[in-house]
A protein has these predicted regions:
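Alpha-helix N-cap/helix-start positions at coil->helix boundaries
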Residues: 17-18, 32, 47-51, 82-83, ...
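N-terminal alpha-helical scaffold/docking segments in eukaryotic complex subunits
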Residues: 1-65, 297, 306, 314-319
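Hydrophobic residues within the alpha-helices of tandem HEAT/HEAT-like
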Residues: 53, 57, 123-129, 173, ...
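Alpha-solenoid HEAT/ARM repeat scaffold
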Residues: 18-21, 51-55, 86-87, 102, ...
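Eukaryotic acidic, Ser/Thr-rich intrinsically disordered low-complexity regions
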Residues: 274, 278-319
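Amphipathic alpha-helical scaffolding segments comprising HEAT/armadillo-like alpha-solenoid repeats
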Residues: 2-7, 30-43, 63-78, 97-110, ...
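Structural signature of alpha-helical solenoid repeat scaffolds
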Residues: 58, 93, 125-126, 169, ...
Length: 319
């Protein structure tokens, strides 16, 4: 392993070469001694090489669940480059390690960079959700919501404000609901999008009227988030509006409407998904319809024949 790491470090420090993607798995789950050696290598890398490496490690962890780079991400949480700190927090977003909320709260409250504070606010949303799911191991649960609320009340920048609103969507506290409502009623389109994301995360059907209304909004960005929220909250009376969005001018809106119909299920959703699966002009939309129909079949406990290729079957019969 030591020789493998030495070879990898040499490759990383040769910045005229592309990152050795296949060899990066050697950085997974480093022990303390190995992490010290990585730190020495890290210090010799240029800022751009560091950013590229850390972002690539995040991508590799997403694609290969057996890879764990948490120790490296934790190591660089105090890197002088704010972009590195932001990437590291993003890479740790899915971790439920109980030691991370304190680090993210420190970043939210004390970091000098708005992009880092915003990343921390985003990451804290996962721990708000865990609290709502009655995870008693999170001792900072009240402080997380309190600090997100306080950050907004202290006049956060637009980017940070939006991140806090989205994370507060996971909270059932009344103050959080007020913040979401205020964001929705603002005249800031970006903030309205964040409010709709928060509504979808809330598991609270109280937001049904707002979501149904925004499915008709002139902005495709607003329509997209409303469509997503309708699926997340399983608003069955949104089905017909979602079907109409399958003819939207925006591919993003179409794809999210497809996903949401798969979440809703029912005859209306199934018929619409089968129709677009058969008639969509591009492979990506067909793929989205396939996935939604597979999910719908899973929800309804029906036989999943959707991946059966009838054309191939016919050819086999002829042969």
């Amino acid at each position: 392993m030591d020789q493998e790491l030495d070879e990898l470090f040499s490759l990383l420090m040769d910045e005229e070469q592309l990152l050795p993607i296949e060899e990066l798995s050697a950085l997974s789950d480093l022990d303390t001694r190995q992490l010290d050696r990585f730190s020495s290598c890290w210090q010799s890398l240029s800022p751009q090489r560091r950013r590229t490496l850390l972002a690539t490690l995040g991508q590799q962890a997403d694609e290969h669940v057996e890879l764990l780079f948490d120790s490296i991400n934790c190591l660089v949480l105090d890197d002088p480059d704010p972009t590195i700190r932001k990437i590291a927090i993003g890479n740790l977003w899915e971790s439920t390690d109980p030691s991370f909320p304190a680090a993210f709260l420190t970043a939210l409250n004390e970091d000098s960079s708005i992009i880092v504070r915003s990343a921390a606010a985003d990451a804290l949303g996962r721990f708000v959700l865990l609290t709502e799911l009655e995870d008693d191991s999170l001792t900072e649960s009240d402080q997380i919501v309190d600090d997100l609320l306080r950050t907004i009340r202290d006049g956060a920048s637009s980017e940070l404000h939006r991140a806090c609103v989205k994370s507060l969507g996971f909270s059932s506290r009344e103050e959080a609901q007020v913040i979401i409502a205020d964001a929705y009623l603002s005249e800031d389109e970006d903030l309205v999008q964040s409010a709709l994301i928060a509504m979808g995360r809330s598991a609270n059907p109280v937001w049904r009227p707002e979501i149904l209304q925004e499915l008709l909004h002139p902005s495709p960005l607003i329509r997209a988030e409303a469509a997503r929220a309708a699926g997340e909250l399983e608003l069955h009376d949104a089905a017909q509006s979602l079907v109409e969005l399958l003819e939207d001018v925006s591919n993003e809106v179409i794809h999210i409407a497809i996903w949401s119909l798969g979440q809703l299920g029912g005859d209306v959703a199934r018929t619409a998904l089968l129709n677009i699966q058969a008639s969509a002009p591009d492979p990506e939309t067909v793929k989205k319809a396939d996935e939604a129909l597979e999910h719908l079949a899973f929800l309804e406990g029906t036989p999943d024949l959707l991946i059966y290729d009838f054309d191939d079957s016919a050819e086999d019969a002829v042969d």
